[in-house]
Structures are given as C-alpha cells and as structure tokens.
Swiss-Prot record:
Top-level lineage group: Bacteria
Keyword terms, alphabetized: Cell cycle, Cell division, DNA damage, Septation, SOS response
Subunit structure: Interacts with FtsZ.
Name assigned to this protein: Cell division inhibitor SulA
C-alpha cells in the first residue's frame, strides 16, 4: 500500500516531465543551462527526470552530446531508454578541466539539441554566464550533472535541481 503511493507519484512525475519536455522543445527561442545534483546511489531518480526530455529532444534533427568523465554509454542502455542511437554522441575520458570549455564550444555550434557534462565542482559565475550565452547562441540545452556520494550527502547540499531560467528572474 505504501509503495502504491510512490508508484502513482512516479507516473505523475513522469507525465509532468513529459509535458515539460514538450513545452521545452516547442519553445525553441532560447537556450537553457541547468545543474542536476544527484546521489550516486540513486541514479534512477535522475533518469526519471531527464529521460522524457531527452527522448523528446531526440526527435529533433540535431545530435545529443554526452561528455562523460569515465563511464561509457552502452548501446543497449541508449536503445532501452528510447534515445535515438544514431543521434547520440559521446566523448568519454574527458578531463574535468576541459568539460566546461567543450560544452561551450558544442552548445555554440547549434549542432546539438542537448549537451550533458559531468562536473564535481560548482560552476563559477563566469563559467555559468559563458554556458548560458553559448546555449542561447546555439539554441540548445546544457545539463551539468553533479554526483554526490551517499557518505558526503550529509555534509553537502541536498540533492536537487538548479534551474537557471530567465522566466523566473
């Protein structure tokens, strides 16, 4: 009985995320940069949040770029997640010091609907502004993925999503 409530929440959450994804892809007048802070031991919540949006963006003619520090995306996972295998590009083993610069370059080109990069440290104001400008110029979305371990969870900020949007400022 208790889990049924969670199952109901997950489906409504997924439905809400799908609606946000539709609105986001229909409103293509500006770029977006968001930071997603998540617990490494609970990756499913991040997938529930991002997959509907990534699936919707996969319908565009542009690529999706994943800048991963160590992990390599498996073809099976990409296909099982409903992402277009022919539009997903990955650069792995990327040094964290090059991630922001690579994201800026990729976002600016306009060749990618979304650029996803992993960073352990917070962005500086200058880095964030540079990413926002690049996303706007390329009419793309950028996600900064910031994993936190369960042990450091008590000392760091709670898992959450930072949405930087001019709609709220």
């Amino acid at each position: 009985m208790y889990t049924a409530g969670y199952a109901h929440r997950d489906s409504s959450f997924s439905s809400t995320a799908s609606k946000i994804a539709r609105v986001s892809t229909e409103n293509t007048t500006a770029g977006l940069i968001s930071e997603v802070v998540y617990r490494e031991d609970q990756p499913m919540m991040t997938q529930l949040l991002l997959l509907p949006l990534l699936q919707q963006l996969g319908q565009q003619s542009r690529w999706q770029l994943w800048l991963t520090p160590q992990q390599k995306l498996s073809r099976e996972w990409v296909q099982a997640s409903g992402l277009p295998l022919t539009k997903v590009m990955q650069i792995s083993q990327l040094s964290p010091c090059h991630t922001v610069e690579s994201m800026v370059r990729a976002l600016r080109t306009g060749n990618y609907s979304v650029v996803i990069g992993w960073l352990a440290d917070d962005l500086t104001e200058e880095e964030h502004a540079e990413l926002v400008d690049a996303a706007n110029e390329g009419n793309a979305m950028g996600f900064i993925m910031r994993p936190v371990s369960a042990s450091s969870h008590a000392t760091r900020q709670l898992s959450g999503l930072k949405i930087h949007s001019n709609l709220y400022h």
